[in-house]
């Protein structure tokens, strides 16, 4: 059995670790609230752009943007959104498992895939599996900015517009609530028909017409690009909210486990100390009896 000094050292070490995980839990909780706010604030912009683009598309049915035209998929692009840091439970593992399954399905159909990595963990993973990475962006920090993402996204959008890929997929972790985050792999391009369709309420709300400058086609082309960029930004915002939630939960679990370990070590320490005292008393009594 370990000595009391060794056990005290272990207890001190676990206590120090618990202080770190507790601090990280509190930091993650603070960042999570800010990330959730950014996520909610990003939604109205994307929805407004979608409404305007849908109105223009329905008013000009003769115009078909490449983003709206489905093609036989022989080559595909995939934008993979992950975190830059670890210590967030199985967040990255789950979304990268979904990416692996999607890649296997596409490759099984004879589809060649080129990838864009957003986040260090995804970049490292794609490098390990030998995927073709055509663009990447890492170290976004706690506050993602669209201008940092546009360069990496544009590579995939240009590839689709030029016919180099026939579909683009988006993989990220969707924020459900603090305790639940769901890995997603969605088709980004071509845009699904329901993405640019209006409900009856929306048609009544947007029953008026626009004055197009310079013309409707140019406006629709620009809006659709902005809309797709907004969808990717929304995915990054959701992923960051998921990251902080998962990290807060993981650090809380680590703190709770450390507390349990400290309790167990304290019990062992007390038993060891009691045994040592009992032994000393026995030796004293034996010595006195011998005299």
Curated annotation (Swiss-Prot):
Localization per record: Cell inner membrane
SUPFAM superfamilies for this protein: ATP synthase (F1-ATPase), gamma subunit
Keywords assigned: ATP synthesis, Cell inner membrane, Cell membrane, CF(1), Hydrogen ion transport, Ion transport, Membrane, Transport
Domain of life, source organism: Bacteria
One GO MF term attached to the UniProt entry: ATP binding
Membrane topology: Peripheral membrane protein
InterPro entries: ATP_synth_F1_ATPase_gsu (IPR035968), ATP_synth_F1_gsu (IPR000131), ATP_synth_F1_gsu_CS (IPR023632)
Coiled-coil ranges (or none): none
GO biological process, one term: proton motive force-driven plasma membrane ATP synthesis
GO cellular component: plasma membrane; proton-transporting ATP synthase complex
Similarity comment: family membership: Belongs to the ATPase gamma chain family.
Function: Produces ATP from ADP in the presence of a proton gradient across the membrane. The gamma chain is believed to be important in regulating ATPase activity and the flow of protons through the CF(0) complex.
Record note on quaternary structure: F-type ATPases have 2 components, CF(1) - the catalytic core - and CF(0) - the membrane proton channel. CF(1) has five subunits: alpha(3), beta(3), gamma(1), delta(1), epsilon(1). CF(0) has three main subunits: a, b and c.
Protein name: ATP synthase gamma chain
Organism: Cupriavidus metallidurans (strain ATCC 43123 / DSM 2839 / NBRC 102507 / CH34) (Ralstonia metallidurans)
């Amino acid at each position: 059995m370990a000595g009391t000094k060794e056990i005290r050292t272990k207890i001190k070490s676990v206590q120090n670790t618990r202080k770190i995980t507790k601090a990280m839990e509190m930091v993650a909780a603070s960042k999570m609230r800010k990330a959730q706010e950014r996520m909610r604030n990003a939604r109205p912009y994307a929805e407004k752009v979608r409404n305007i683009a849908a109105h223009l598309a329905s008013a000009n049915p003769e115009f078909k943007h490449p983003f709206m035209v489905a093609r036989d998929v022989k080559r595909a692009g995939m934008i993979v959104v992950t975190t830059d840091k670890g210590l967030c439970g199985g967040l990255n593992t789950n979304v990268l498992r979904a990416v692996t399954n999607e890649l296997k399905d596409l490759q099984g159909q004879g589809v060649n895939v080129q990838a864009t990595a957003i986040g260090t963990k995804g970049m490292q993973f794609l490098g390990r599996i030998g995927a073709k990475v055509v663009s990447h962006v890492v170290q976004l920090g706690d506050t993602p900015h669209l201008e940092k993402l546009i360069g990496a996204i544009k590579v995939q959008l240009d590839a689709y517009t030029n016919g180099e890929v026939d579909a683009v997929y988006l993989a990220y972790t969707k924020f459900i609530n603090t305790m639940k985050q769901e890995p997603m792999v969605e088709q980004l391009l071509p845009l699904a028909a329901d993405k640019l369709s209006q409900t009856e309420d929306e048609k009544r709300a947007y029953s008026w017409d626009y004055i197009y400058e310079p013309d409707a086609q140019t406006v629709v082309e620009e809006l659709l690009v902005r809309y797709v960029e907004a969808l990717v930004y929304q995915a990054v915002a959701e992923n960051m909210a998921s990251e902080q939630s998962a990290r807060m939960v993981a650090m809380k679990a680590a703190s709770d486990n450390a507390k349990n370990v400290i309790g167990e070590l304290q019990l062992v320490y007390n038993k060891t100390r009691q045994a040592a005292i009992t032994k000393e008393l026995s030796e004293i009594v034996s010595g006195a009896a011998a005299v």
